[in-house]
Amino acid sequence: MHFSLKQLAVAAFYATNLGSAYVIPQFFQEAFQQEEPIENYLPQLNDDDSSAVAANIPKPHIPYFMKPHVESEKLQDKIKVDDLNATAWDLYRLANYSTPDYGHPTRVIGSKGHNKTMEYILNVFDDMQDYYDVSLQEFEALSGKIISFNLSDAETGKSFANTTAFALSPPVDGFVGKLVEIPNLGCEEKDYASVVPPRHNEKQIALIERGKCPFGDKSNLAGKFGFTAVVIYDNEPKSKEGLHGTLGEPTKHTVATVGVPYKVGKKLIANIALNIDYSLYFAMDSYVEFIKTQNIIADTKHGDPDNIVALGAHSDSVEEGPGINDDGSGTISLLNVAKQLTHFKINNKVRFAWWAAEEEGLLGSNFYAYNLTKEENSKIRVFMDYDMMASPNYEYEIYDANNKENPKGSEELKNLYVDYYKAHHLNYTLVPFDGRSDYVGFINNGIPAGGIATGAEKNNVNNGKVLDRCYHQLCDDVSNLSWDAFITNTKLIAHSVATYADSFEGFPKRETQKHKEVDILNAQQPQFKYRADFLII
């Protein structure tokens, strides 16, 4: 007897509704006579429409012990461009939930777009509850916004080129104040004691050179010694742009602070030399606030819990745009690898993480890493950071880790990426750790770390053009993705997961002591000069 796909669809329909896939309705027996075909009551299907048939047939559940052991090539083979594309469009639709509030799509923390992104990730894992344990880690993220600012010559009203306001700067009403140069970089109290302090109710502006200590320290000390605002000038003579920096978490002494290029700073010093009472007009409209948000952590139920393979991407974007490359691409890659990993057995536990508030200064990943107990810390064998996997004018970037300056194992991770690109005859570029992504908290706490990227605002070493023309802009949407880079790097992520989920053979054992116990915001000499996209020193 031969059944058409239409008849099989009817069988599936009735079998499902009778509660058993093994019940075959009697109307398929040859003796049964049907006056009007039952298909007339159902949506019509073409004989070759196998996908519609499959949708009506419950998929069998394969117990964990029956699954094949994870192999890199087999896991990579399950990564498909169509899946990446579908998830990218999903994220863009979620970013549009913010449009009524922001006037454009965004997934910045605190927005509906970011909240929907987190809901989306959790919904994906609802279908994988037999493979993963999912937890939320809530924290308060420090955020803020510079609405407007003005730094200009008090006499002429002329503003200064490439002046920038520091993130997390407090507001100040417009005022005219004498500009005072602070000696010795303004990092110690004695630097301020050497100048005449402002008189009671007198408003003055401190002019301080960049260097030695974080910008926040300079602002705090200036405020403590009575200055109403601060101008920090760059110490790099070739710099033409302003200082794109952050003050970090403000204190009661923090004052409104802006940055200017080296040449502008030297011009201001010359103006003071000509006129000891030289003054500026200074104003800033801004706010600083705390926003409650969450990290999402998904652990495999199986695998050795004392040998954890950890990897992460950040779930948020900047306010200016939807962030589909930065870091929607990393979010998408991790989700797709997590889905496909469920087809396999593993030897070591795998931990997928989506960090919130990366764009505010790596806040989610730092909160996680700094709040690990010593025992929890020691169980993480490696952390892999996946931020910006698909820049349109991409280069394959690998963090240039070594075991001398970084926790042991970081160099082995770098070599895994190098070997992969070489095996696929792809050129790659080694880039330094600079503090701009979520590996920072792990390295500072002794956990081997590294990662790959495809580049942001810098130029491609091969063609001299910007790597991501839409970096931190509204145009960072689905059209801003390189699908070649996206599929290649997602397969590499799958390779890294499969490799370490199988074995850490040849990988250094974890050191029992934390690598460096430092406060990256307030240390006199931070290990990295950046915190996310912001300079801190």
From Swiss-Prot:
Localization of this protein: Vacuole
Glycosylation (residues): 85, 96, 115, 150, 162, 371, 427, 480
Gene Ontology biological process: protein catabolic process in the vacuole; proteolysis
Single GO cellular component term: fungal-type vacuole
Enzyme nomenclature, EC number: 3.4.11.15
Record's signal peptide: 1-21
EC main group: hydrolase
Active site: 358 (proton acceptor)
Site (Transition state stabilizer): 471
Main location: other
Quaternary structure and interacting proteins, as annotated: Monomer.
Family: Belongs to the peptidase M28 family. M28A subfamily.
Additional comment: Present with 4740 molecules/cell in log phase SD medium.
Protein name: Aminopeptidase Y
Gene expressing this chain: APE3
